[in-house]
Structures are given as structure tokens and as C-alpha cells.
């Protein structure tokens, strides 16, 4: 009788050790940026500022109804904007990341609408999409922590 009881106690001890070793403590989500994270994000700041000024140049092309240059400008000087925004999104805090990704997708949806409307010479649609794109980009820039 002692043998099964000892065996049962040994099995319970192994099972408890296994369960404790497999359990995990819930990881805390960081609520503030570390100095290294801010430094990494700030490396993108000049590039994002340049892209913001390029958005103003796009507005000038739209205002002048220069459709060919508008389409070319979207695919040329603004071509790297998506990659930069995605890289920045990945470095933000988790609570800001999803919003940044959504704003990036929205901005590029707006640029596609501008592209299509410019090809169709639809000034009203181009200007509406441009204003929405600028708003999305400004909202994205608000997510970037200040140094």
C-alpha cells in the first residue's frame, strides 16, 4: 500500500513542477519609451519632415491641375513614404502601433484615390482625397514622440 501512495506522491510532485515551469507570467506592455526607442524613432524625424513638405508640393501640383506631374510625384518622391511609415509604426508603443498602421493604410488609400482621380481629371475628387491624405499624415505625425 505504501508503494502506490509513494508513486502517486512522486507523480503529483512531477506534475506540479511541470505545471509551474510551463506557466508564464503575463508580460507587461510598456507604457513609456526608452531612450533607445526615442533615439531610433528620432532618426526618422527628418525623413518624415521631408515627406510632409513633399505633400505640400503635391498640393501645389493639384492646385495647378498638373495631372501628369501629380501622378508622377505620387510614384516618385512619395514612393518611399510607405516604407518609412511602416518602419516608424513598428517602433511605436503597442497602443500606438495599430493606430499608426491604420493611418498608414488610410493614407495610401487616399494616394491611390488621388492617382485615379488625377488620371480621370476629376479636380473635386483629387482635392478631397488630398485633404484627407494630409489629415491622415498629420494624425500619424502626432503619434511620434517628441525628443
Task: Show the residue positions of the predicted features.
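Bacterial N-terminal signal peptides that target proteins for export
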Residues: 1-11
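C-terminal motif of bacterial Sec signal peptides marking the signal peptidase cleavage site
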Residues: 18-21
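Immediate post-signal-peptide N-terminus of mature secreted/exported proteins
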Residues: 23-72
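A structural signal for well-ordered alpha-helices, especially hydrophobic packing surfaces
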Residues: 52-62, 82-89, 111-118, 137-144
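Short helix-adjacent coil turns
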Residues: 65-69, 114-128
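Short, charged, amphipathic alpha-helical segments
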Residues: 71-76, 97-105, 124-134
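Short, solvent-exposed, charged loop/turn and helix-capping segments
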Residues: 81-101
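C-terminal partner/receptor-binding element of secreted or periplasmic proteins
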Residues: 121, 127-147
